[in-house]
Each structure stands twice: as C-alpha cells, then as structure tokens.
Amino acid sequence: MKVGLVLEGGAMRGLFTAGVLDVFLENNIDVTDIVGVSAGTLFGVNYVSKQPKRALRYNVNYINDKRYMSLKSWIKTGNLINKDFTYYKVPFQLDVFDNITFKESKTSFYATVTNIENGEAEFIKITDPYKQMETLRATSALPFISEIIEVDGKKYLDGGIANSIPIDFFEKKNYDKIIVILTRPISYRKKKSTSIQFKMFYKKYPHLVEKLENRYKDYNETVEKILELEKQGKVFVIRPSEDITVKRLEKDIEKLNHVYNLGVKDGKHIIENLKEYISYKGEK
C-alpha cells in the first residue's frame, strides 16, 4: 500500500507539523513518500531521521541568536536567516541531524521548490540532506528576505509560491492513501496581496511575479479541493484546532512552544482515526 504525506509550509507555524509528526513517531506511523513545502520540508526531515523534538529544540535554542537570523545578515548577504550558521553549523555541529538514519529510511522525501524562471513547482528528491542543503534552503527561501538559490544551474525560491499544498503530487500517481498536514485552521482563506512590490523586486522574472500575484487564488482553490476530497474519504487531513497567530519568524519562545504543543495535542486527538484510515482496505 502506498501512503503519501503532504506537509504544508508556513514558517514558524510549521512547528505545529513538527508536533504532529512527533506523535506519528510515537505511534510508529510509517508512510511511503513525503512531499514537503518550505518549513514542512525543513521540519519534516526530522520525522524521517527519527529525531523527535529536534525542530522545536534548535529553533527555541537559536531563534534569538543573531548568528541564526539578523538584519545584519540580510543587509550583508540578502538572507535574513543566516546561511552558514543556520543551515550548516546547526545541523552539522550544534544540533546534529541524523543524516545516516535519513539515508537508510525506506521513505522517499521530496522538497517543493519554485523555479523562478518559469514559475513552476519542481519536486526534488532528497536522498542526502547534508549534500542537498542548498535544496533545503531553496524550498524555504522566502521572497524579499532571501537570496535566489541556484541548484544545478536552476534558480529557485520558496516552494509555496508555486504550490503551497502539493496534493496533486500524489493524486497523479494514484496513491492508496493521502495524509495532509495543514498549518491553518479550516476557516482560513488567503487574501490578495499587493503586486507592486512583486514587480519591483522580481521584474526580471515575469512568470514568478504572475505566480506571486495569483498565489491567493491557487491556495484557496487547493483548500476547497482538499475539503471535497476529505468529504469523500479520499484524504485524511490534520489541521490546527485553533488559529495559529505566530509571526512568520516568531521569536517569542513561549509562543513557539505553544504551536508545537498544539501539534502534539491535535496529533494525539486524531491518531486512532488515522490508524483506522491507513489500515482500511475498502474503496478509496
């Protein structure tokens, strides 16, 4: 049986996902393939490496460290989140990522990135996070506060621009079961953003600008589609039981802990239903 898992992004809202995934680990929930977007990728790799609480731990420990994120870094490098410290020193030295366990896992992991030259989403298979750290940077490279990331000659930004919730990744491949972890409550719909700043910053990339301008439509259409599939029993959706009000790059440790703990609480609430969904062999 093929079980797919979709992980929405959302910057620090992604700690909700981290909490849910830690409940998955506690209950030995295994999936065949994962597709992550932005923070969904960054935090989701810890599920495959079987490192509960790591995503919460390194964020709580370093979010207020100027080496992790600072205006100085943004002015100097174009990255508000410091590349060398956050993506290299932390996972390689300070809070070591279990790269061996990840590579030995039977679960395949795909990172969603946005090709800024054609505006399309691409799904890059992550087989070795240590060697593919630039791809992990690319999936979470937020517009305006991140430099454009080049991987194998292609230019990328945050995967959520082109495909915030890539459920179609699994639909096209006829997976038996699809699990979706969202970081917004059921009532949330994205509003239109001003397009002036998009055109100013990225005038060389018209396809990217078009995606940014229409992102709210694409997002809302996907949410409606997921609701319909959920009603039909074709997907299992996990979403926050309350609105998550943290800022994208929240620095309040208490709030970060709350988001993670909400994920744990909501994960425990649905876990038995999830087990039943996965084990059910009837019509999809």
Functional labels for PLM-detected ranges:
Residues 1-37, 45-284:
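Patatin-like phospholipase
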